[in-house]
Amino acid sequence: MTIRGYGRVTPLQMDMLELGGEILSPGGSEPASDEERLSVMKEARQALTKQTGRDFGFDLAAWHQFLLNDAKLSEEYTFAYAWKAVKRRIDELLDDPDRRRLERLLNEHP
C-alpha cells in the first residue's frame, strides 16, 4: 500500500507503524484519538503475532529488534521502497513519550 510520507510500505512495515500508534491511510498519517490509537495498536500486535508466531506484547523496541534480526522477516521489514521513512518514524516513536504512555495503558489494561 502506498502511504503519503512513507511511500510503498510492506505489511510488516505498516503493522510496526500501527503498533507505534500511527493511524495510516493512503492520504498519510492522521491525527487520532487515544481510543483510535489504542485500537490500532491492539490490531497491529495481533497481526504481528499471527505473522511471526512470536509475541513481544506492545514493546515496539523488542519487535523492531526481532524483525531486524530475523533471517526470514528482515527482508520484508527493511524492504527499500519505504524503509528510510519507516525507520525514521519507528526511531521517533521509540522515544515518543505519548506512545510510551499508550503502551503503559495497554499493558495495565489489556
Say what each PLM segment does.
Residues 1-110:
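Extended repeat-based scaffolds of very large eukaryotic assembly and lipid-transport proteins
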